[in-house]
Amino acid sequence: MSLESLIQWDQQASLWLNKLGNATWDPFWLMLTDTRFWFPAYGIIMLFLFRELGWKKGLAVLLSIIVMLVTVDQSCNGFKAGLERLRPCYNAWMIAHDIRLPYGVTGHLFGFFSAHAANTFGFAATSFLGFQLNRPKRSYRVYGWCVFIWAALVAYSRIMMGAHFLGDVLVGACYGLAVGSAIACLTHYLIVKARL
């Protein structure tokens, strides 16, 4: 498959997914895509983190989450500036085919790859592995399901808002998972080494 064919498929799939939206659900997707909505959930998870792991391991995992978020967010900005792929809301083909923009044009000009998807999947991986690796006798399966479903919904909200193509979201999710998993495993190694 050529790059041109892949781009066309990505545009068509993204447009189809975007048009599944409607005015009834738009406020829900807007709420999910708004990072201010995430902070109460982050706070609750941090309290749970310290309760489950104690303050030393909890602090180490919290720092790993912060490092992951800064790393992923800043590198996403670098990719966007370097690759210069227009967001769907600025793409002439998408506009000509009536992309839904429920709240108008969103974000800066370039969007490859999705920082929302990368950050949320990175957070999901880092926090889930932070729990599971550092307290292996407990099962965090329910937490894992919840946090990864939340990450997927946030990523999908970016398509619904017309801010990202499906490919932007998939690459962002994979990138976040990779960086988050690597940082979580490194943190676990350091916790074991330091005998926290």
Residue spans of the language-model regions?
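N-terminal transmembrane-helix/juxtamembrane module of multi-pass inner/ER membrane proteins
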Residues: M1-G43, C76-L109
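Membrane-interface elements of multi-pass transporters and channels
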Residues: L20, T24, E52, G82-Y90, ...
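Membrane-interface helix-boundary signature
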Residues: W25-W29, L59-L62, K137-Y143
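Hydrophobic alpha-helical transmembrane segments
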Residues: T33-E52, L63, F121
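Alpha-helical membrane-inserting segments
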Residues: I45, T71, S75, F79, ...
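Interfacial segments of alpha-helical transmembrane regions
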Residues: M46-S75, G144
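Membrane helix-loop-helix hairpins that form the core translocation module of multi-pass transporters
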Residues: I65-L86, L170
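Membrane-embedded catalytic cores of phosphoryl/pyrophosphoryl-handling enzymes
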Residues: R100-L196
